[in-house]
C-alpha cells in the first residue's frame, strides 16, 4: 500500500493554509538558491517525483499527406514532400517562384522533419485509424482521457480524416463503432447517472430522467425529419456498417475483450455524447437547432471547475445506446455546422468543431456507483488561410481572421510550453487568449494525453504554408504533456471493491489533490491563479468537506461491511481499518512536510528576487554616472575651444607688423581662397545631388509593383484557362446531347413503326365488327316488324272480350318491355304451380303480385263455385301466356345479343379514341422530331459561329505572341546596346584613371601646398624665413619679432582647418564605399548578361518544340477529319431511315382518316336507332295516359304516373344533355378531321423542307466535320499556345524586371557621368586658378625681392598690417562657413531620413569627389614646388582634357540618341500591349455576351419543352375526361333503359291490379246479399270494401299488395296472418326531410317536415345501443310463422335497389292456437297498430328516429273512435300467456339509417334474451 500511495503522479497541491498549525522552521539554509534543488525534493518525496517524470509523455504527432487532385496532377508531376521512412519526411524547396511567397530562398534546398508516425497519400482510412487512433480508443475504454485534434491548411483533408464520406468513413464513426462493438452487453441502459462539468456526475431523479428521454426522442425526431428530405439514415448506417465489416475490427475487439475480462462483470458503461463548435470565438451547441423566430443560436459559456479543468456550461449531453444513434446525432450536428464556399475549398469548415464522448464506469449493484469518468475529445480544427489565395471578403474574411488568431494562440501556447521546460523560470502560457486554447488548457495541464494529426498537401503552390505547418508540428512534438489525472485516478480508485461513489458534493480527495500550486508546479496561465483570500476560503471549505466525507466514508464502509458479512471476515475488517488509519497519518505527515518545503522555496525565491533587484539598481546607477561624465567632458571641451578662439582674436589685434609675416600671410590667404572655392563647389554638388535624388525617388514611386503586375497577369491567365475549360465542357455536352437526340429519334421511329402495325390490325378488326353490327341490325329490324304485327293482332281481339283484353294488354306490355330472364322464368313457374294446386284442390286461383302476393279469401267453397265458369278462359289465357313466354325468351336472347353488340361498339369506340390518341401522339412526336432537327441545325450554326470566333481569337493570340516575341527580341537588343554603352563608359573611366596617374606629378606640388596650409608642422616657417634672410639680411630682425606673435594666430587657424580636414576624410570614406558598390553592380550586370544568354537558348528550344508540336497536330487533325467523315456518313444513313419511317407514318394517318369517316357514318346510324327507340318510349307513355283517362276511379295511379313523368322529364333532360354532348363530340371530330387535313398539308410542306434540309444537313455535316476537326486542332493549339503565352508572359515579366534594373543602372551611370563631368570642369577651373595663383605668386616674389632691395621697412609694415586685417576678415568668413557647414549637416541628416534608398549613390559620389580633391591638392603642391618646369606639362594635360571633354560630349550625344530610340521603342511596346489588352477585353466581352445568349437560348428551350410537356399532359387529361364522359353517358343510357324496363313492369303490375280489383268488385256485388243475411252485418259491409281499397292503395303506392287482417291465404297448407294497416307513410330518398302521412279515412296524404337529427356522441351512442337492444327484446314476437313464397323471394331479389317498407310484425292477443281462423280474425286489438308502427319505425331510416313520437301522437286522435267501436262489437279473447312488450310505445328509435331490410327469420341471441325486460302490468 505504501508503494502505491507514494507513486502518485498528482500535481503537488498548496498546503499553505492547513487546519493543523505547523511551526515555521527556525533555521533554513539559503546558500544554494541557484543550485539544483532536485536533491532536496528527492529527499522529501523521491518516489512521487520519479513517477511524475515517468508519467510525462511527449505530444504524439501523426502526419498525413493528402494525394494530388486531378487539377494538381495536370499542373505538377512531383510534389515538394518526400517520405524517407515511417517517421521522417523531407520538404524540398520548389524551383519555381510561384511556390514561394517571398523571392528570397531560405538557404536550405531540403529540410527534414520527424514525426511519431507518417502516413503517405496511399494510406486508407482503415490503416490510418488502426495506426493512429486505435490506441487512444483502447485507453478510453481503460478509463483514461484523451484529446485528438487535426491541424493544417484549408483543403488539406482534415474534415475527410475526421468525418470521411459515406463510402470511406473517417475517424469519428469508426471510433463509435469500435466502442460499441467492444462494450456490447456491458452498456448501462438507465439514464439516472449523467456526466456533469469535466470529471463529475449527477444522479438524476425520475422526473429528470423522463426529461432526458423526452429530449433524446425529440432530437431523434429531428433527425427523422431531416432524413425525409435527404437520404434515409438506414441507408447511411447501412453504408457505414458495410464499410466497417466485422473483419476489420476483429483484432481490436479481441484486445478489448482481453482488457474487459480483467474487470468485474458488475461493471457497466454509460456512453454520453456532445457536439459543439467554436465559431468567431463564440461557442454553439450543434445539437440545438437555429430558432425560427430570431434566426440565432444560443451562445454557450466556457468556465472552469474548482480543479481548474475547463468545461462548457449548459452543453447538451445525450446518452447513446448504439453506434447507429451516435452516427445519426453526428449527422445532425454536421447539418448545423457552419460551412462556407471559398476559392480553395467548396465546403470549407468555418469553425472548430469538437465531438466529445464521455464514458461513466458504473458498478451496477443495488445502489449503482460511478467508479471512473473517462473522456475522448475529437476536434476538427478549421484550417489556416491566406487571403491572397482564398480571396475572401466580408464575413468570410472575418471568419478567417478569427480562425488564424485562434491557431496562432495555439502555436504560442505550444511554443511557450516547449521553452518553459528548458528554462528555470516558468513562463506565462496565454491559454485565455482564445476559446480553443482555453478548452485545451486542461489537457495540456495533465487531464490526459494529446494526439495531434497534421494534414498537409504535397502541392508546390502551398510550399510556404506547409513549411510553417511542419515547423509548428516539430515544435509541438517536443512538448511534454503530463498525464497526472489518469494516473491519479488509477491510484485513487484502485480495484472495484474499494472504489467510492463520487458525486457533485462529495469529491474532496480529487479536489485537494488537483488544486494547482503556483510554486512547485509553476502554473502555466496567470489567469488561472487565484487570489490568496479565495485560496484560503476554498482550501478551508475543501478540508471541512474532506473531514465530513471521511466520516461519511467510514460510515459507508461500516455499512457495506455489515451487509457483506458472509464474504468478508473480521480479520479483513481490522486490516482495512488499520490501513485507513495509516493512510490518514501519512496524509497528515505529508501535509506537514509539504508545508515546510513550500515555505523554504518561497523564502528562497524572495531572496533571489531581492538580490536580482539590487543588482539591477546598481547597474542603472553606474550607467547614469558614465553618461553624466561624458556629457560634462564634452561641455568642457566645447568651452575650451570657445575660449581659445576668443583669445586668439584679441592677440591678433595687438600684434605688430612684419614684412616677412605679410608674405607668409599672403601665401596663406591664397590657400584659404582655394578652400573657400572647394566649399562652394561642395554646396553646389550637394544641391545637385538633392535634386537628382528627388527625381529618382519620384520615378521609383511612379513605377508599379512587379508583384502586383505579375499577380494581375496570373489572374487573367487563370480566367482564360477556366473559360477555355468551360468551352470544352460545353462542346462535349453538345456532342452528348446530339448523340442522345439521335438515339431518341431512332426510338421514336421504332415506336412509329409499331404503332402503324397496331393501327392496321385494329382497322381490320373494326371492319369485321362493322359487318357483324350490320347483320345484327337487320335481325333487330325483323324482330321489330314481328312485334308490330303481334300488337295489331292483340288490338283486334280487344273488341271481342273485355276481360281477356286486360290480360292481353298486360301480356303485350310484357312483350314490349325488356325484362331480365331470371325474374320472368320464376314468375311463369310460380303461376304454373299455383294453377296446378288449384286444379287438384278445385279451388279458385290465387291472386298474384310482383312484390307481395297476398290474395285472401274468406269462404273457399263459395268462391270456387263462382269462379268455375272462368276456368276455360283461364286455360286460353295460359296458352297465350306460354306463347308469350316463348316469344319473351326469344326477345331476351335478342336483347342480350344487342347488349353484347353495344358493348362491342363501346369497345370499338374506345379503340377508335385510343387510336386517335396514338395518332395525336405520333403527330406530336413528329413535331418534336422536326423541332429537334431544327435545334440541331441551330446548334450546328452556333457551333460554326463559335468555331469562327475561336479561329479569330486564335489568330489574334498568335499575333499577340508574335508581337510579344518581337518585343522580347527588341528588349534583348536594347539590353545588349545598353551593355555595350556601359562597357564604353567603363573604358572611358579607365582612361580617366590612367590620366590620373599622369597627373601625379602635379599632385606632388598640391601636396606641398596642403602641407603649407596644415599648421601642425612648425618647420615650414623657419625654412621660409631662411629663404628671406638669404635675399635681405635687414628684414631678419622684423621677422624675428613677427615669429613671437605669429604662433598664437596660427594655432587657432590650424584647429579650424583640422576640423574641416576631418570632414573631408569622412567624405573620402563614403566615396570608397560607393566605389565598392559600383564594382558589385558591374558583377550583377555580368550575371544579367549570362541570364539573357540562357533565356535566348530557352527561346530557341521552345521554337523547336513548337515546330514539332505543329507537325503532331497536323497528323492528329487528319485522323480526326477522317473519323468525322465516317460519323457523318452513318448519320446520313440514319436520317434516310427516319425519313422512310415518316412516310410510312403519313400513310398510316391517311388510313386512319378513312377509318374515322367510316366510324362517323356508323355513329349516325346508331343515332337514328336511338331516336326510333325514343319514339317507341313516347308511344308507350301515351298508352299509359290513355289508360289513366279511362280509369278515373284510381286517383293515386295518376299521381304515381306524374312522378314517373317527372323522372321521364329528367331522363329527357339527360338525353338532351347527351345530345348536346354528342353534338360537341361531333364538332370535335370535325375539328380533328380539319386538323388532320392541316397536318397532311404540313407534312407535305415538311417533306419538301426536309428534302431541302437534307441537302443543307449534308453540307452542314461536311462543314461540321471540317469545323469540328478544326476546332479540336485549334483547341489543342490554343492550349499549347496558352501555355507558351504563359511562359512568354513570365519571361516578359522577368525581362521587364531586368530592363528596369538595367535602366536603373544606366540612370545611375548617367548620373555618375554627369558628376564626373562636373568634377572635371571643377578640376579644370581649379587648375586655371592654381596657374593664375602661381603666376601671381611668382610676380609677388619678384616684387618682394625688388621691394626688399629698393623699398624700406615701413612699406613692409604697412603690408603686414593689411595682411593682418585680411586675416581677421578671413577668420570671420571661416566661422560663417562653419555655421553653414553645421546647417548643411542638419539638412543632410533630414535628407538621409527622406532618401534612405539613395544614400549609397550619394556616398559613391562623395568618395569620388574626395579622390579628385586629393588629386587636386597633390597637383597644387607639385605646382608650387615645380612651377617653372610644369607649365609645359600643364599645357599638355589641358590639351588632353579638352580632347576628353570632346569625346565625352560625343558619347553623351550618342547616348541621348540611343536613349530616345529606346524610349520610343518602349512607348511603342506599351501602346501595342495596351491595344492587345483592349482587343482581348473586347473578345472576352463578346465571348461573355455569346455565352449569355447561349444560356438564354437554353433556358428558353427548357421553358418551351416544359410548356410542351404541360400541353401534352393537358391533352391527355382532356382525352381521359372525354373517355370518362363517354363511359358515363353509356352508363346513363343503360340506366335509362333499365328504368324504362322497370316502369313497364310497374305499368303491368298496375294493370293486373286493376283487373283483379274489377273482378273482386263483381264478386263482392254478388256476395253482398248473402253476407247481409248472416251475422254481424256492419262488419260484413265495412271490412271488405276497406280491405280491398287498402289493398289497391298499398299496391299503387308501395308496389306491393298487403292483405287485410281478417283474410287468410292458404298456400301449401300454411296459414299466414297479416295486420290491417292503420296508417300509410310515404317518403323518398331524394327528399329525406319530407314524409307523406295518410290516415285511413282521408283520401289525400298530409306532408310532414322532419328536421335533421343531431349527431350524438360516442357515449350516448353506446347507451342508446343498450336501450335499443332492450326495446327490441321487449317487443313480443309472434308465434305464427308466415310462409314466404318463392314469388316473394323472387320479388325481393328483383327490387333490392328500392327501399322496401316492411309490414309491422306485432300480432294481437289470441284466445288459443286451435280456435277457428275466422273467429280469431274477428277478435283483434286496435292497440297493436301503434306498436306495429313503432316496430316499423325501428327498422326505418335514421330520419324518422327523432320524430317518431310526434307522428304517433298525431295519429292517436283519429284512431280512438275505431278502437272503441271494435271493443264494443268484438268480445275480448282470453289471455293464454303474458307476452313481453315495451311499455313506452312512442320511445325514440335508435337504428342506423343504412339498415332498410331486416331479416324476418333472425333469432335472438342468449345475450339479448338476458337483456330483455318484463313489461309492466297494465290495468284492465
UniProtKB/Swiss-Prot annotation:
GO terms for molecular function: ATP binding; ATP hydrolysis activity; microtubule binding; microtubule motor activity; plus-end-directed microtubule motor activity; protein homodimerization activity; WW domain binding. Residues 1265-1274, 1760-1772 have a biased composition (Polar residues). InterPro entries: KIF11-like (IPR047149), Kinesin_motor_CS (IPR019821), Kinesin_motor_dom (IPR001752), Kinesin_motor_dom_sf (IPR036961), P-loop_NTPase (IPR027417). Residues 58-479 form the Kinesin motor domain. Phosphorylated during mitosis by CDK1. Residues 829-866, 1247-1275, 1760-1781 are annotated as: Disordered. The modification Phosphothreonine is found at residues 560, 1644. Residues 1560-1820 are annotated as: Interaction with PIN1. ATP binds at residues 152-159. Brain, ovary, kidney and testis (at protein level). Overexpressed in bladder cancer cells (at protein level). Expressed in testis. Overexpressed in bladder cancer cells. Keywords: ATP-binding, Cell cycle, Cell division, Cell projection, Coiled coil, Cytoplasm, Cytoskeleton, Microtubule, Mitosis, Motor protein, Nucleotide-binding, Nucleus, Oncogene, Phosphoprotein. It is found in: Nucleus; Cytoplasm, Cytoskeleton, Microtubule organizing center, Centrosome; Nucleus, Nucleolus; Nucleus, Nucleoplasm. Residues 523-603, 674-793 form a coiled coil. The keyword Protein biosynthesis does not apply. The modification Phosphoserine is found at residues 488, 997, 1588, 1658, 1715, 1740. Residues 1050-1107 are annotated as: Necessary and sufficient for interaction with SHTN1. GO terms for biological process: cell division; microtubule-based movement; neural tube closure; neuron projection morphogenesis; positive regulation of cell population proliferation; positive regulation of cytokinesis; positive regulation of intracellular protein transport; positive regulation of mitotic cytokinetic process. SUPFAM superfamilies: P-loop containing nucleoside triphosphate hydrolases (SSF52540). It comes from the Eukaryota. Oligomerizes (via kinesin motor domain). Associates with microtubules. Interacts (via C-terminal globular tail region) with PIN1 (via WW domain). Interacts with PRC1. Interacts with SHTN1 (via N-terminus); the interaction is direct and promotes the association of SHTN1 to microtubules in primary neurons. PANTHER family: KINESIN FAMILY MEMBER 20B (PTHR47970:SF29), KINESIN-LIKE PROTEIN KIF11 (PTHR47970). This is Kinesin-like protein KIF20B. The gene is KIF20B.
